[in-house]
Amino acid sequence: MIGTPYTEGARRAMLLGCGELGKEVAIELQRLGVEVIGVDRYPNAPAMQIAHRSHVINMLDAKALRAIIELEKPHLVIPEIEAIATQTLVEMEAEGLNVVPTARATQLTMDREGIRRLAAETLGLPTSPYFFCDTETEFNQAIGKIGVPCVVKPVMSSSGKGQSVIRDVSQSAKAWQYAQEGGRAGGGRVIVEGFIPFDYEITLLTISAVNGIHFCAPIGHRQEDGDYRESWQPQAMSADVLAKSQAIASKVVEALGGYGLFGVELFVKGSDVYFSEVSPRPHDTGLVTLISQDLSEFALHVRAILGLPIPNIHQHGPSASAVVLVEGKSKNIRYQGLADALAAENTQLRLFAKPEIDGRRRLGVALARDKDIESAVNKALDSASKVKVIF
């Protein structure tokens, strides 16, 4: 049962993290009459701007997180980011709190070690070789065992922060220092992974719902500096490789438990599929589904977490997204060129309304459909390039 916002019977959902993905989740929640409470570490975050009300707290502060949940008494807590005091969610879930998809899933995927050990050691899924390291000595030993090229990531980081590829051992010291600076909790543990010379990488959006496991068409994407620049759907792949990908995604999602949409990242090399990472929430590469599907990844996530069935997911054809990425410093961000950006057929634009920029930041995404993937990607890139950001 869903009530009406601001009434005694309202169904209340609390978003922990109010970025651009949380904003789209909030919109879908409101379309189904859910009262939305936004929580983030800074004011006027994108989802806060449309939530029924919002709070600013340090979500890594266990006491502050517990206090705001006890104050609002939400029926659902929806983590949108990793930087959260997840042990508090585990404790409160045991007390009856409904965490989406589960507190365990949120905790396991908060750091790369938990989810990698689940996938490789518990589920026996194919992954790249890896070592976890606490010291620079262990780090150098791991590189010696794995060899170069290899990939280095802080176990707790996002959006490519602290991530680098070592192509020569002379780069080791610099990579260690960069990883120590890029972790969410400051310096600390890192993962060293063997580099898989993959043919392509995909995000397989996988939904666990009351009526079973469902998949969106595979999404291809291009990464740069550890963050996505373009994504497209569908990624061309053989039926055999798709079946292998879906089998891996199903195992991971079922092991994590709960209802919701999961972004499962996979590497494909020939007919082999390797597990990379998983997010127990909508994925940034899945922004393409805002134009490529009748139900976006956000609509699917909300249906699933509300206990509603997932119908057949219709994919509209070759579609792409391209980010509007800007570097600068301002608290007065304005946009020009929108008419040019939207002049072509089957193009859309999402400006995230982030309140400020200090360095490099993703401020929007251009979306496009066309006759084939290459044309759709080029159209999205052209649209994004016409958005002029004024500081």
Curated annotation (Swiss-Prot):
ATP binds at R112, K153, S158, S159, G160, K161, G162, Q163, E193, G194, F195, I196, E201. Residues 117-306 form the ATP-grasp domain. GO terms for biological process: 'de novo' IMP biosynthetic process. Its EC number is 6.3.1.21. One of its GO terms (cellular component) is cytosol. Pathway: Purine metabolism; IMP biosynthesis via de novo pathway; N(2)-formyl-N(1)-(5-phospho-D-ribosyl)glycinamide from N(1)-(5-phospho-D-ribosyl)glycinamide (formate route): step 1/1. Keywords: ATP-binding, Ligase, Magnesium, Metal-binding, Nucleotide-binding, Purine biosynthesis. InterPro entries: ATP-grasp, ATP-grasp_carboxylate-amine, ATP_grasp_subdomain_1, PreATP-grasp_dom_sf, PurT, PurT/PurK_preATP-grasp, PurT_C, Rudment_hybrid_motif. It is an enzyme of class 6 (ligase). Disulfide bonds: none annotated. N(1)-(5-phospho-beta-D-ribosyl)glycinamide binds at E20, L21, E80, D284, K354, R361, R362. The keyword Metal-binding applies. It comes from the Bacteria. PROSITE patterns: ATP_GRASP. The keyword Acyltransferase does not apply. It catalyses: N(1)-(5-phospho-beta-D-ribosyl)glycinamide + formate + ATP = N(2)-formyl-N(1)-(5-phospho-beta-D-ribosyl)glycinamide + ADP + phosphate + H(+). Mg(2+) binds at E265, E277. GO terms for molecular function: ATP binding; magnesium ion binding; phosphoribosylglycinamide formyltransferase 2 activity; phosphoribosylglycinamide formyltransferase activity. Pfam families: ATP-grasp (PF02222), PurT_C (PF21244), RS_preATP-grasp-like (PF22660). PANTHER family: FORMATE-DEPENDENT PHOSPHORIBOSYLGLYCINAMIDE FORMYLTRANSFERASE. Homodimer. Belongs to the PurK/PurT family. Involved in the de novo purine biosynthesis. Catalyzes the transfer of formate to 5-phospho-ribosyl-glycinamide (GAR), producing 5-phospho-ribosyl-N-formylglycinamide (FGAR). Formate is provided by PurU via hydrolysis of 10-formyl-tetrahydrofolate. This is Formate-dependent phosphoribosylglycinamide formyltransferase. It comes from Shewanella sp. (strain MR-4). The gene is purT.
